């Protein structure tokens, strides 16, 4: 847990802190007082995920003595030593521009890396030579790069975005209390509306194609192209089950029995396009590791054509690449990394 309470003059760099992180820090400090500096071995695939402050937190966890020797007693001191702040104009959440000061770039990098590598043994994907398949050529230009699909907003979506801008102005001018409306709520509503207006208002009707229509169209296109493709089974022979697999990531609109959700809406569109209902599965069906293992086996063996899930549930440890031909990211994870 890298959420160790950290104060900073740059508001975006401060960490409020969590109980698990504080507990972990206290236990390490206790062991360090009793047994010396070498008290823990830590492994992580994301030493920096949400904020540059996490680099400072990791050094506090692992080698606070090096920070002390360098005369660094706070994040502000660390940032002044190894980074530079820049104040620039940037786009605000509701449109328009605002001044924002942020930790923009590193300085004294060799010195910082020397301190970092005393405790950290860093291995990149290139160092490990991890086998990663090539991205298929884009139909538009033949380049092996991610393809971004741009959709025009419907008039209804444009009207809603305008209302969000009005809400943001009211929050900024303190015409409403933070319990009534705030920028976090506004940002969340904007993300929901960008996926589908029905996530903010179930009765919304849009006059044109929406994002889920485009997603379904592309999934069905790949399915039609690869539904007859043959694959090898675990014995090396030809599998009797034909067809490929596609993964769909969406962190919003997850399955909900009590209200409209994007997952089931997408499934309906795929079924209407000719895909068998039992070929479309949700990662949320798997309630435990055993159920997840069975679902992944069905995906590897060709009994699942589309597996839909969130980053939290399907972003790590998803061993289903045998038949994988496409990944569709319907929305973006709400984190920098």
List the predicted regions and their residue ranges.
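Inter-lobe coupling linker of SF2 helicases/translocases
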Residues: 13, 17-50, 61-205, 209, ...
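A solvent-exposed, charged loop/short amphipathic helix patch at secondary-structure junctions
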Residues: 2-17
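A short helix-turn-beta junction within AAA+ P-loop NTPase domains corresponding to the substrate/partner-engaging
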Residues: 55-68, 324-329
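Conserved helicase ATPase core of P-loop NTP-dependent helicases/translocases
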Residues: 276-311
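Conserved strand-helix element at the start of the C-terminal RecA-like helicase core
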Residues: 175-183, 239-264
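Conserved helicase motor "Helicase C" RecA-like lobe of SF1/SF2 P-loop NTPases
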Residues: 252-282
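SF2 helicase motor core recognition
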Residues: 1, 47-52, 293, 305-331, ...
